[in-house]
Amino acid sequence: MALTFIGAMIACLAVLYIPGYLLARSFPFSRFASAALAPAFSVLGLTLLGVAAYELVNPCPAPALAGALIALDLAVYLICRIVRGVAAKAGDRPSSADSGASNVRANRAPSTELISIPADARIWKAAALYIGVALIITSIVFLGALDGFDSFSRNDDTTVHLSVARGFLDTGTFSTLHTSSFLDQGEIGGFYPAAWHVLVAVVASLFGNDVSLATNAAIAVFNIVMFPLAICLLTWRLFGKNRTIVLSGALFSVAFSGFPWGFVVFGQLLPNMISFMMVPLALVPFVEALDAPRARDKAKLLIAAALGLCAVAIAQPNGAFTFGILAVLYAISRVFFEPGAQRATVDAKRVAIAIAIFAVACVLWGAMYLAPFMQAVVNTTWSATLSPLEAIISGPLFMFTVRQGVQPFLSVMVLVGIVYTCRHRRHLWLSVAYLAALAFYIISVSTDGAAKQILTGFWYTDYNRTGALAALFAIPLAAVGFASCVAWLKGLLEKRMGKSSVRPAPATKDEGSIAEAPCSPVASDAAPCTAASANASFTRAGVIAAAIMTALFALCQFLPLSVGYGDRQIHLGLVNINQEISTRYSWDQTLTSEEDAFIDEVMEVIPEDAMVINVPADGSCWSYGVEGLNTFYRRSSNTGSRDDAQEAELIRTQLCNVATNKEVQQTLEDLDARYVMLLDDPSGDNPTKLSLRYEEKNWTGIETITEDTPGFNLILSEGDMRLYEIEY
């Protein structure tokens, strides 16, 4: 199974990176930028092709969807390369007056790459560090906690995610405009941000339609490769001349329990996870566009940013508002700071422009809040669960819910990062974004009312999502804080070890002037650091300082300590996340391994695609998504997520009377339902049931069926599990 899982990860990487890389090189972006940006372009392309295929080629095999995207992006890349080649040759033709200098001009031709990266080999080494650290953290927190690579999370939303991906595979349709948990039963469906599900379906199609395996592989790929590379690109763009900060960012891309791991243990909110992860891929081209000197380059970069934003929104619309917060704050900061400037230029004109940008953003926010198509989202309310004081304490400790552990080390790093940005105000917008997100979390988790709806309604007023927002915005601040502490500790060590310990790396052309290196946690603009101090990792003291700080990071994240608070234990770091994943992915929970094996037997006994009436709370709500069993109820609720609530009520309350109830008989005829499956005996000693939205009185029509009930023939049994054929 391990080799199969690795194969699924490789397939996911190929789908995410090959088509998107080709399109990014068409702009052309540099090789590293193209690799980092590729997932956004691939996700957008897959989703749009899925919509087109629904109208033009229905059904469409999942591998064909990925193949078509690769072919299309390859064609675009080749055409763009040919056009650029022709244009370059035309521009290089010497006239009679300057033919003697033609070779010199050719050798001096500037690069046309966008987001070009000097010392490209170094950024690839940094990227390798990001991936390596993320691999270690993900292996400890996620992969090591799985009860098999094909296990799945026993979460409520997971029933939908697995069913939607399975429905895409069963029907050969991949349109986000026609999404439902019941596509295989003929439902047309409606709009749902299903970019995640399209990707999972494509990967699963290459591995026997194993949706659970593909889901876990995709989670691993996004956390080990995709998001770390996105953060690497972002930190390079913001702090490129300070390699200490860039390298420090490797520790923090997947270090916060609130994001990304909070979305893995709660919900699961996997579409929202990848939406947030792609925000840097839209932000970096936007930042570059504001600084680009040529109008043509600005246009290309804004197009790339728009494509990235579309990918973010199509994965989960609230990601677009997440991007908007960062983009607006950076744009306001950019008004006062020219490219490369360390000090702000403040005058009446710039202040007016900044106010105008903020005012326009507020107007757009209000317009979207009042838009009719947003009302179902912004009017959703999650009731407050904490007092304001509790929220103010838990938020900065990055324990946004009971599923997450406190992370005091990260709190200190972020605080130091905030102090740093207050001194180096070019990056102050990062702290403003984080503090705004933290305020959103505090408001969403501890208050109710109009302010909560207006400010956090785009995230469903869900404190899980606003907490993740704060964690996402904290990542670059943590990197800055860590680098600042390393530089400060390095200075202390040098004083104790003597000057002989200092072996600074020689300044290179693109590193020789670094005014932003953090010589101390509170270094000021009045005393900029040197290239030698910025590259702390190239001294003996710097290496020791980095090692000490990294060891502290590891201890505070993974040490299995806990403190008592009321009637519960609060764990440190990511330990609680690991325990949550271990519990939720266990085959001893709800849908057990024995029950899953029984489902396999059921699928062998009954005709293919035969509908089975079930009680979703006994674990069978996952049986369609996990195994492909055509169940009637696919979520733990009275309707099982079906549109016809009256039909669902009749079945769950009156099915046991099928021998005499004509209405039940007619409903079964309409549904073509001939089987009933029970995975638990409600009167048994140890039923593995969900308590969510389950009341025994609502399911008496199914759970009271026995082999003595008229109209039912027992055809398969094992322990307390039963399969009946309906006969009347």
Cite the ranges covered by each PLM segment.
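Membrane-embedded, hydrophobic transmembrane alpha-helices
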Residues: 1-124
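Membrane-helix boundary/interfacial segments in multi-pass membrane proteins
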Residues: 7, 56-64, 148-154, 208, ...
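Extracytoplasmic
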Residues: 11-14, 552-728
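Membrane-interface helix-loop junctions at the exits of transmembrane helices
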Residues: 46-48, 139-146, 171-174, 246-265, ...
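Active-site lumenal/periplasmic loops and adjacent helix-entry segments of GT-C-fold
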Residues: 127, 135-277, 577-592
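Membrane-interface transmembrane helices that cradle and orient dolichyl/undecaprenyl
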Residues: 279-300
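Membrane-interface alpha helices of multi-pass inner-membrane proteins
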Residues: 300-317
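Hydrophobic, aromatic-rich transmembrane alpha-helices
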Residues: 408-431
